Amino acid sequence: MKTTLIAAAIVALSGLAAPALAYDGTKCKAAGNCWEPKPGFPEKIAGSKYDPKHDPKELNKQADSIKQMEERNKKRVENFKKTGKFEYDVAKISAN
């Protein structure tokens, strides 16, 4: 009885583990490099009709805003070191 119960448990557990061993259909070029284009799409997107052709000015907007943010933060820190009070509004800092 005990061996039958153990055998049934082993069969049940192996049945649960089987899907993990299933082949997922990818053909990896190297370990971890398993990307494949969907059927009907080109191997390379650049230059194809699916290329989004981003405007460089639009792409640089975030970098520019980060530079401006860092400049404002630098002014806030310099003002805090001078006065000992933190002022969020940079326009008020330049007036001092």
From Swiss-Prot:
Disordered: annotated span: 45-75
Secretion signal, residue range per the UniProt entry: 1-22
Molecular function (Gene Ontology), one example: alcohol dehydrogenase (cytochrome c(L)) activity
Gene3D superfamilies: Methanol dehydrogenase, beta subunit
Subcellular location: Periplasm
Cysteine disulfide partners in this protein: C28-C34
InterPro entries: Meth_DH_bsu (IPR003420), Meth_DH_bsu_sf (IPR036557)
GO biological process: methanol oxidation
Enzyme class at the top of the EC tree: oxidoreductase
The protein's assembly and partners: Heterotetramer composed of 2 alpha and 2 beta subunits.
Family named by the database record: Belongs to the methanol dehydrogenase subunit 2 family.
Designated name of the protein: Methanol dehydrogenase [cytochrome c] subunit 2
Lineage of producing organism: Bacteria, Pseudomonadati, Pseudomonadota, Alphaproteobacteria, Hyphomicrobiales
Gene behind the chain: moxI
